[in-house]
Amino acid sequence: MSTFRDDTGSHGASSNLTGHAVLDDHHMKVGTISDVVYDDAGTPRWAVVNPGPLRSEKFVPVEGAYMTESGELVIPYGKEQVKHAPKAPRDHILDSRTEIVLEDHYEVRHSN
């Protein structure tokens, strides 16, 4: 296992992360990473997860997540918690109000 990290320093989709499977805290597949949201310092803060056809994409915090040797991102949240998170907008832009709602939903706080 390795710590979740991305060295691109960019904002938006990262070829190093997009397309990787996301597993919940019981190693059940939640979906696939379609985009990554970075903070101003270039640190990844949120993964946009596509759960599959006919389902809405969701933001998932990367804090506490890790990459397996086989390349899956394991998050410390259950599939149901992700399922009930607010939908990610189509443009994947995360405004401050939505981020607060997401932090409450996942019970995380990011330092600014």
Model-derived features: positions:
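Peripheral interaction segments used for macromolecular assembly
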Residues: 1-112
